[in-house]
Amino acid sequence: MRVLVLGSGVIGTASAYYLARQGFEVTVVDRQPAVAMETSFANAGQISPGYASPWAAPGVPLKAIKWLLERHAPLAIKLTGDVDQYLWMAQMLRNCTASRYAVNKERMVRLSEYSRDCLDELRAETGIAYESRSLGTTQLFRTQAQLDAAAKDIAVLEQSGVPYELLDRDGIARVEPALDSVKGILAGALRLPNDQTGDCQLFTTKLADMAIKLGVEFRFGQDIQRLDFAGDRINGVWIDGKLETADRYVLALGSYSPQMLKPLGIKAPVYPLKGYSLTVPITNGDMAPTSTILDETYKVAITRFDNRIRVGGMAEIAGFDLSLNPRRRETLEMIVNDLYPRGGDLSQASFWTGLRPATPDGTPIVGATAFRNLFLNTGHGTLGWTMACGSGRLLADLIARKKPQISAEGLDISRYGNSREVAKHGQSAPVHQQ
């Protein structure tokens, strides 16, 4: 059985790998010249199942108003006049309740924990190397109010059986010695010892090589134009003016997925959250982080690779704009100087931006659609790296009609209740272009 995977980021590549392991004949198509060239290229590098949390949370609407007035705010909104942007923000606001937050976080943690287990198994079986570390994640709280507010997250961690540790200032210095000199500005921390780090782009490149050895074909520089359909089946995909056919189709196009689905009558509430990162060469390993640090105030992660620090985070709701905002670089540099002033050479840092495909409830869309042979693996937001292996393996099981190792409840598009409207056959969607 032939499967055509659209998109070669970490999600599409993981999907292809796990499908090939199940014996499918897999072809991956992407517009870029190699895998992981867009959102997967320079993300923060953290694999943090326990910190899998939706942006839509109680109190966020009021915080967002305050953030609009701050220079180093973690969230910025640039209104584009796009109706989809307004609808997405309205849906997000509806998820900012305690009850919805608990449901959404449970779904995210469920998939993230499974994904980490799949990654551990993959690493043990294959020895795949991607500058990984398994030294946990430490979330820093600069105020007592932030520390107190972590109680709701801890409740979900306990419910999900995720190990955690609350740290005072001395405890922070114990797990992250380079923070000893600045611990006075911190109120405490929450540490998840089972979290990991790694270079997502390097991992995806290595995984693609392994997939090729299993028979997967990668085709790069291809213009994915539209899906061709009739009734409840996909007939093929128009690629560079030619109709490509398969038995099953997987859409893993990140933020560009909804525009490809709209002509089919499928409303996928995925919208780009623009994020930024700095990659900083380490000058003094003893003064750099040992693993991943999350700065709760600025919603930024600082991650240690072998000889580099990756600083990433923030979110701009600004459509598909990929311009580099110098103010965001200023914020990232400020945070590095604040916490690790002697760890790296900021003058040699590389600045990057990418579009994370976010759903209004934070949970990705993984699973079947109203079309019998079309499957989605998209909407992972800031957690594509964390959820990649689990999402790929879960989707492969669903396509193979095998019982998944975790519950898939609440993960597919049917949770939005509008999985398909009547669509006209042959309507074009020339969206996956630059």
UniProtKB/Swiss-Prot annotation:
Annotated EC: 1.4.99.-
Stretch forming the signal peptide: none
Superkingdom: Bacteria
Gene Ontology CC annotations of this record: cytoplasm; plasma membrane
Annotated binding of FAD, by residue: 3-17
Pfam (any one): DAO
Molecular function, one GO term: D-amino-acid dehydrogenase activity
Pathway: Amino-acid degradation; D-alanine degradation; NH(3) and pyruvate from D-alanine: step 1/1
Keywords: FAD, Flavoprotein, Oxidoreductase
Cofactor: FAD
Role of this protein: Oxidative deamination of D-amino acids.
Family to which the UniProt record says this protein belongs: Belongs to the DadA oxidoreductase family.
Designated name of the protein: D-amino acid dehydrogenase
